[in-house]
Amino acid sequence: MSDLTTIARPYAKAAFDFALEKDQLDQWGQMLSFAAEVAKNEQMNELLTGSVSADKMAEIFVAVCGEQVDTHGQNLLKVMAENGRLAALPDVCTEFYTLKKEHEKEIDVEVISATELSDEQLANIGSKLEKRLERKVKLNCSVDETLLGGVIIRAGDLVIDDSARGRLNRLSDALQS
């Protein structure tokens, strides 16, 4: 875990709690995403690591973000600038979305298959995972022909390897032990 992630967590939690209270989770997500992209900009990054005062940095950052960030978002940016934490904005955004997904009981699931899956197969996988994980599931599908057949499903810490390659590897391990 990076230092910036540790630094970002309290800011993300504060932004999340405020957005939840005001019923503005999506709006805050968009604001933080925009501000994070500004912070990632090479020229802005040079400015962040330079010797500009916190007040001037906040002023510049708010001006660059313009109307994309409302008054409350600007206040967050000013507080982060005063504490020299604007470089952590991308991590704040990531942590915010993690909290948002947890709140909405949603999880991203990576489904890797040997061939393209049909809509019916995807719906079946999605419904079974929703039941097992007790969350809304967002499937991100990809094809890896080296699997030979079957699928690999990754959802957070859960990994289900039902691929032909995985089965062959497990069989090989069992025979060698």
From Swiss-Prot:
Gene Ontology MF annotations: proton-transporting ATP synthase activity, rotational mechanism
Keyword Membrane: yes
Family matches, as PANTHER family: ATP SYNTHASE DELTA CHAIN
Entry protein name: ATP synthase subunit delta
Quaternary structure annotation from Swiss-Prot or TrEMBL: F-type ATPases have 2 components, F(1) - the catalytic core - and F(0) - the membrane proton channel. F(1) has five subunits: alpha(3), beta(3), gamma(1), delta(1), epsilon(1). F(0) has three main subunits: a(1), b(2) and c(10-14). The alpha and beta chains form an alternating ring which encloses part of the gamma chain. F(1) is attached to F(0) by a central stalk formed by the gamma and epsilon chains, while a peripheral stalk is formed by the delta and b chains.
InterPro entries (UniProt xref): ATP_synth_OSCP/delta_N_sf (IPR026015), ATPase_OSCP/d_CS (IPR020781), ATPase_OSCP/dsu (IPR000711)
Entry's localization field: Cell inner membrane
Pfam families assigned to the protein according to its UniProt record, in alphabetical order: OSCP
Membrane topology annotation: Peripheral membrane protein
PROSITE patterns per the UniProt record, alphabetical: ATPASE_DELTA (PS00389)
One GO location term (cellular component): plasma membrane
Keyword set, alphabetical order: ATP synthesis, Cell inner membrane, Cell membrane, CF(1), Hydrogen ion transport, Ion transport, Membrane, Transport
UniProt family annotation: Belongs to the ATPase delta chain family.
HAMAP family found in the cross-reference section: ATP_synth_delta_bact
Gene from which the chain derives: atpH
Role played: F(1)F(0) ATP synthase produces ATP from ADP in the presence of a proton or sodium gradient. F-type ATPases consist of two structural domains, F(1) containing the extramembraneous catalytic core and F(0) containing the membrane proton channel, linked together by a central stalk and a peripheral stalk. During catalysis, ATP synthesis in the catalytic domain of F(1) is coupled via a rotary mechanism of the central stalk subunits to proton translocation. This protein is part of the stalk that links CF(0) to CF(1). It either transmits conformational changes from CF(0) to CF(1) or is implicated in proton conduction.
Matches recorded under Gene3D superfamilies: N-terminal domain of the delta subunit of the F1F0-ATP synthase
